Swiss-Prot record:
Protein's UniProt name: Translation initiation factor IF-2
Main location: cytoplasm
Keywords: Cytoplasm, GTP-binding, Initiation factor, Nucleotide-binding, Protein biosynthesis
Similarity section: Belongs to the TRAFAC class translation factor GTPase superfamily. Classic translation factor GTPase family. IF-2 subfamily.
Described purpose of this protein according to its UniProt entry: One of the essential components for the initiation of protein synthesis. Protects formylmethionyl-tRNA from spontaneous hydrolysis and promotes its binding to the 30S ribosomal subunits. Also involved in the hydrolysis of GTP during the formation of the 70S ribosomal complex.
Residue ranges, compositional bias (Pro residues): 118-136
Organism: Nocardioides sp. (strain ATCC BAA-499 / JS614)
Skewed-composition ranges (Low complexity): 57-68, 77-117, 141-153, 180-198, 224-233
Skewed-composition ranges (Basic residues): 310-319
Region (G4): 544-547
NCBIfam families linked to this entry: IF-2 (TIGR00487), small_GTP (TIGR00231)
């Protein structure tokens, strides 16, 4: 299903796309344009917040067309309103004359061509200056309106409004028609608020050819501005008459007639009817023209600016930013704004780009800072939590990495979904079966006990007789004539399956702790007990194997009392049942104890009339049916055809099967079922939820997959510092064992990876799991192993297709295992074999030099007596004189017994030897022979 676009939403609610974009911006959603798509959570939020309001406004929309004509006149009203305060402030009595001005100007337009403008009354001068000379008559100047004949009281210029946008500064473009010096504003432009004009606006004259000018707008009058000393000589000047045949613009007196505007008149033919366009003193501004308070403008095409630019006062925000930049810490030559100790929330596996967006800095700055701190990280690379916390501490930020639970909850809340929401109406609750987890030490009979309860033989199907999967079953029992259902979850007992036991205890209501009567309490028994206590579930103890001769149930009760499980017969509150799974003894009493504990301690009710939510117990990849997930419904009812999302997997439920392979149409609370139809294999222990449609399920799954991938990359990334890099360059590359794990179920793969991660054989050898998955070994796995020099570990799986041939051709090793501890032992041995060998010195013997024979051919020959051990020909020797080592790590050039060469000479025999490259020997020196022996690495 395609995503909704912004313009589609706007069309649906009858508003403009701009309005929808603004609302998304207020909501904090980044939407670029009207054609951009909108994610489903953002669309739902928009509909929830603005949908009803927009629909209500749309229902009242028919009254809007009547107001459209008035809306079109708004600009004219606005312009009139702008000029109205000035006209009222100048002279209220001039309003009737100003109203009649357009008609008078229209009647006198033909006569205006030959008539000179009548000078209006001048305001009182602000500063004493010589009066300007009389204006020359302009041939195209219009006749003054009647309103100008009435003198108005002079008034001081009104203060300029704060924040008035200034005119754009002209550039140094020599090809422009005007550079802005003494440039007349366009006809019809609104008057400047601070112009100080105390006369009503002069109506525009008719254009040549009888074409009327633009509607009369108040024209700025520089003559009424305060005068300033001129940089140039004051004098009349004009732009000259208009070109023949060219209609000139308005007939108002030009700037040349204003005091201080005349001077260097160009006289070039230009716009007609506006004398005085030359350079001159600007009224109230700096040399170079412009309004009062405006920046200096250019004097020529490539000339200097008209004066020093006045820099405005900096705002508080600008000053604060400059101060923060000066106070920012400098790390590795990079200056970054320092935080105030605020908390920055980041997801797992976040990159430096994510961190930079939170604190409003450039990612490249953080990359350089980490490089100076000894970490080589790219801007888009997933970074582990320690690195983010280190960087945040340097910048005075508290980095809080969001936990996976909070991360998933925030994701679901963005789709208006709440997991584990039990705040339903009490009237909708119905009783559900208890969920019981069977836990205990390995080989204490947990699976055998479940086989006896459900009359099956699961233990025979497990490799080595050890449960390596989580199984979920539902059995029926008769308690006081009532048929009761109990859901059992079987967990492995091996130490490598700690996480699977923890998942089992957290998803159950009651824990059945199985303890063998002959072995007693074992390490995994205590661990399972701690998991059950941490989950806060009641415990029922099943003392198994009581039919064996060496069984001692009393000893088991005494041992468990030390861990806080006091039997009822001892005055406690824990039920103990002596059973035998092999003989099927007292199994009914165990089921009755489970039901009584559930009725007495728990309120087992759920709402079946809602969308299903629950837990993925186990998942695997079936060759014929695809991904198969064993789920446990915790609330609601799951139906065939529901859209479901479980971790990174999503899809529609195509079929449901029970533990016996029978098809189910629905799964009620506490009902385990196998679900078919998912896109991929979900992780064991992940939650599943039913959503509205496939589109929402796909979006949730994709976001989860992206977050898991980022977290996995940050977890796998080897922290490589500059010091480590330099050291590895000096002494050679360190050894690294790359593995690819493939298993039959996701829980076993997870347990194997966790167990391998705990193997520690030193810093010289490292273990890296580059890929893991569920299902058969494929050619893709072999290609990856060949490219990364990895070994493939297959746990209860075999190669598929031509993967074996490809592995033989590429030289990739594939190891197969069915029991987890065999894989752990062999991989640990392989890691130890990759270690660099360690050597220790072993002393072989000593010989005393009794005589020295000199030979011109071989040098000094030492005649020795072996006083201890043995002297070997290929051994290393050292020379000791008076207890001090004179020479060390020497080779024997020759060793003879009498005249024959000898490989070794034992204690009590004489020999002659020659030391290679050492002749400084004396009688009485001790020659000690030794060798370096390799010792195994522990």
């Amino acid at each position: 299903m395609a995503k909704t676009r912004v313009h589609e939403l706007a069309k649906e609610f009858g508003v403009e796309s701009k309005f929808v974009l603004e609302k998304f911006k207020e909501m904090g959603e980044f939407v670029k344009s009207a054609s951009s798509t909108v994610e489903l959570p953002a669309e739902m939020r928009f509909r929830k917040e603005y949908g009803e309001k927009l629909k209500a406004e749309a229902s009242a929309a028919p009254a809007a067309p009547a107001e459209k004509p008035a809306a079109k006149k708004a600009p004219a009203k606005k312009a009139a309103a702008t000029a109205e305060p000035e006209a009222l402030a100048a002279e209220p009595a001039a309003e009737p004359a100003a109203a009649e001005a357009p008609a008078a100007a229209e009647a006198e337009a033909p006569a205006a061509k030959a008539a000179a403008p009548k000078p209006g009354p001048k305001p009182a001068p602000v500063a004493e200056q010589p009066a300007p000379p009389a204006e020359p008559e302009a041939p195209e100047a219009p006749e003054a309106p009647a309103a100008s004949a009435a003198p108005a009281a002079p008034k001081a210029p009104a203060p300029r409004p704060v924040g008035r946008p200034g005119a754009p500064r002209p550039g140094n473009n020599p090809f422009a028609s005007s550079q802005g010096m003494g440039r007349r504003p366009a006809p019809g432009a609104p008057a400047a608020p601070g112009a100080g004009d105390n006369r009503p606006p002069r109506p525009p004259a008719a254009r040549e050819g009888g074409v009327p000018g633009r509607p009369g707008m108040p024209r700025p009058n520089p003559a009424m501005m305060p005068k300033s000393p001129s940089a140039f000589g004051a004098g009349p000047g004009g732009r000259g008459p208009a070109r023949p045949g060219a209609p000139g613009r308005g007939g108002a007196p030009g700037r040349g007639g204003a005091p201080g505007r005349g001077g260097v008149g160009t006289g070039a033919p230009g716009r007609g009817g506006a004398p005085g366009g030359g350079f001159g003193p600007s009224g109230g501004g700096r040399p170079g023209g412009g309004r009062p308070g405006q920046r200096g403008q250019t004097q020529g095409a490539f000339g200097r600016p008209g004066g020093p630019s006045r820099r405005g006062r900096k705002s508080k925000r600008a000053r604060r930013q400059e101060f923060e930049a000066m106070e920012a810490p400098t790390i590795g030559g990079i200056r970054v704004r320092k935080g105030n100790g605020e908390t920055v929330r980041l997801p797992r596996g976040a990159s430096l780009t994510d961190f930079a967006e939170r604190i409003n800095v450039e990612p490249a700055q953080l990359v350089q800072m980490l490089f100076s701190l000894g970490e080589m990280v790219t801007a888009t690379e997933s970074v582990n939590d320690e690195t983010l916390e280190l960087l945040g501490e340097e910048l005075n930020y508290v980095v809080e990495v969001v936990s996976p639970e909070d991360e998933d909850r925030e994701l679901l809340e963005s789709f208006d979904i709440e997991f584990a929401d039990d705040e339903d109406d009490e009237g909708h609750f119905e009783a559900r079966p208890p969920v019981v987890t069977v836990m205990g030490h390995v080989d204490h009979g947990k699976t055998k006990l479940l086989d006896a309860l459900r009359h099956a033989n699961v233990a025979s199907g497990e490799a080595g007789g050890i449960t390596q999967h989580i199984g979920a079953y539902q059995v029926h029992t008769d308690v006081d004539g009532e048929d009761r259902k109990i859901t059992f979850i079987d967990t492995p007992g091996h130490e490598a399956f700690t996480a699977m036991r923890a998942r089992g205890s957290q998803s159950s209501d009651i824990a059945v702790l199985v303890v063998a009567a002959d072995d007693g309490v074992m390490p995994q028994t205590v661990e399972a007990l701690n998991h059950a206590k941490a989950a806060g579930v009641p415990i029922v103890v099943a003392v198994n194997k009581i039919d064996k001769p060496e069984a001692d149930p009393t000893k088991v009760r005494g041992q468990l009392t030390e861990y806080g499980l006091v039997p009822e017969e001892y005055g406690g509150d824990t039920m103990f049942v002596d059973v035998s799974a092999k003989s099927e003894l007292n199994l009914d009493k165990l089921l009755e104890a489970v039901v009584l504990t559930a009725d007495a301690s728990l309120d087992l009710r759920a709402n079946p009339n809602r969308d299903a939510q629950g837990l993925v117990i186990e998942a695997h990849l079936d060759r014929g049916r695809g991904p198969v997930a064993t789920i446990l419904v915790q609330r609601g009812t799951l139906h065939v055809g529901d859209s479901i999302v479980a971790g990174p997997a999503h899809g529609r439920v195509r079929a449901m099967l029970d533990e016996y392979g029978n098809e189910l149409t629905e799964a009620t609370p506490s009902r385990p079922a196998m679900v078919l139809g998912l896109s991929t294999v979900p992780g064991a222990g992940q939650n599943f939820i039913v959503v509205e449609d496939d589109r929402m399920a796909r979006q949730i799954a994709e976001k989860r997959e992206a977050r898991e991938r980022a977290a996995m990359q940050a977890k796998r990334r080897v922290r490589r510092t500059l010091e480590d890099f330099m050291a590895s360059m000096e002494k050679g590359e360190s050894q690294e064992l790359n593995l690819i794990l493939k298993g039959d179920v996701s829980g076993s793969v997870e347990a194997l990876e966790d167990a391998l991660a705990k193997i520690d054989v030193g810093d010289d050898v490292s273990l890296r799991v580059i890929d893991r998955g569920v299902g058969a070994i494929t050619e893709t796995n072999v290609d990856l192993a060949a490219a990364s020099d990895a070994i493939i570990i297959g746990f209860n799986v075999r190669p598929q297709g031509k993967a074996t041939e490809l592995a033989d051709r590429e030289g990739v090793e594939i190891r197969y295992y069915t029991v987890i501890y065999q894989a752990i032992e062999e991989i640990e041995a392989a890691l130890k074999g990759m270690l660099k060998p360690e050597f220790e010195e072993s002393t072989l013997g000593q010989a005393e030099i009794r005589a020295i024979f000199r030979s011109s051919k071989v040098g000094n020959i030492a005649g020795c007596m072996v006083i201890s051990g043995v002297i070997r020909r290929n051994a290393k020797v050292r020379v000791i004189r008076d207890g001090a080592v004179v020479a060390d790590n020497l080779d024997l050039a020759s060793l003879k017994r009498e005249k024959d060469d000898a490989s070794e000479v034992r204690e009590g025999f004489e020999c002659g030897l020659v030391l290679r490259n050492f002749q400084d020997i004396k009688e009485g020196d001790i020659v000690e022979a030794f060798e370096m022996r390799e010792i195994p690495r522990a």
